[in-house]
């Protein structure tokens, strides 16, 4: 069986001396990827994004010189339409909504939901995609994603022409919400949420390398994710949320959230789709539906 060259619609590459290795791991498996903006400082200007893109392309040269990084900016209420157009000119395709404090490098995230509506309206006008980390701050950890569904529903209602990606779904309630929301709302699934429950994080033993945000949840939540992923619905596609951290930041008293899956994501997906008797659905999941939703041409490479 030959697979199309996959797209990853949610990847973290970090910064500094370790970044080139993370890039090489990613591009060994993927031809395109949505690059997350929660760096320090955040990706929030055309100049910073252009330089980050240059570094990524430089690191990719030895492995996949035609790799295409699809850039994003970190949403805040202060952008002008010119800012957005300038960022689009250097390769930005989406903005990322991080609620304040819910995940890595999100302390400067959104604390006033409606304050970003003017910027979101500009994004809708310009055809930018809104990617959402859907967890409600202050809720019990397993309830944060279900509690955020109302925010996505509000965005979909208020901005009907805006494409919204509810990222890395981890709950049956969120899966059902995406199914019933209009066609301008889609979702990504990670490999680890397809495979794990909370037992795999804190069940018989504490497994820090399985710790991520949003947390894997109950078996019935995983079952809903798997059913949707294997269904062939164009609303669901791959975003690995591959998130590298140094070993000392995972194996410590206060470990960082993130599963580093880039080097093994595609073999694991082949395994899981095969076990489910759904290998015929895998090409669209990894290299079709996401491109369609983002308005990109489907890859012709294998």
At which residue positions do the language-model features occur?
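Short helix-capping segments at alpha-helix termini
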Residues: 57-67, 157-161, 182-183, 278
């Amino acid at each position: 069986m030959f697979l199309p060259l996959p797209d990853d619609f949610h990847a973290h590459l970090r910064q500094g001396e370790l970044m080139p290795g993370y890039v090489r791991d990613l591009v060994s498996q993927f031809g395109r990827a949505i690059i997350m903006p929660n760096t320090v400082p955040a990706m929030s200007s055309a100049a910073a994004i252009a330089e980050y893109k240059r570094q990524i392309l430089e690191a990719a040269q030895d492995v996949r010189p035609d790799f295409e990084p699809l850039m994003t900016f970190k949403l805040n209420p202060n952008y002008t339409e010119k800012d957005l157009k300038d960022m689009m000119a250097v390769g930005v395709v989406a903005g990322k909504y991080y609620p304040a404090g819910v995940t890595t490098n999100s302390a400067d995230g959104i604390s006033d939901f409606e304050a970003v509506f003017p910027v979101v309206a500009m994004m809708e006008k310009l055809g930018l995609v809104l990617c959402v980390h859907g967890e409600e701050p202050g809720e019990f950890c397993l309830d944060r994603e279900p509690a955020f569904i109302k925010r996505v529903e509000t965005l979909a209602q208020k901005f009907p022409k805006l494409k919204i990606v509810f990222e890395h779904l981890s709950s049956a309630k969120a899966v059902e919400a995406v199914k019933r929301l209009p066609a301008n709302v889609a979702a990504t699934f990670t490999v680890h949420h397809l495979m794990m429950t909370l037992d795999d994080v804190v069940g018989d033993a504490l497994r820090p390398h399985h710790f991520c945000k949003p947390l894997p949840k109950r078996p019935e939540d995983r079952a809903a994710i798997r059913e949707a992923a294997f269904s062939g619905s164009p609303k669901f596609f791959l975003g690995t949320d591959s998130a590298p951290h140094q070993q000392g930041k995972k194996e410590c008293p206060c470990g960082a959230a993130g599963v580093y899956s880039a080097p093994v994501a595609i073999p694991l997906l082949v395994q899981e789709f095969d076990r489910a008797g759904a290998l015929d659905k895998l090409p669209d999941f990894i290299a079709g539906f996401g491109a369609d939703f983002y308005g990109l041409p489907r890859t012709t490479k294998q």
